[in-house]
Amino acid sequence: MAITQAVANVFKQELLKGNHNFIGATQNGTAAAYYLALYTSSATLGATTTAYSTGNEITNTAGTAYSAGGQVCGNPSVTGGASVATAYVDFDNVVWASASFTANGGLIYRQDSGGPTNDAVVVLAFGGDFTATNGTFTV
């Protein structure tokens, strides 16, 4: 089992269908937000990951800093244009205060009130376990 950093294949397809708009408050008439969920080293995530799942999602070793589903990725901004070969979206740092858990990677996914729901966007591999013990965990 491994977490392999990748843009999710399903995201590429859904992007071409017009199902992702990082800047708009709604997409296809439905409210949408992007979340970051964290996973243990037992998770298998990569390009073929299709959606958010609770399987091997992290849990708190103490306290309640982390909730299933993760946290909203706030204030997205899109960079790129005609003069550059790469475009990307950047979010504010996602921060868990008073955190006590270990994470090996994460999944950014779209959560909305209409279909498609919880579609994977990108898998983040941290390159190993990172642990917070009653401290701040920032991605």
Question: Where are the model-predicted features located?
Answer:
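Small cysteine-rich, disulfide-bonded extracellular modules of the LU/uPAR three-finger superfamily
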Residues: M1-N104, R110-V139
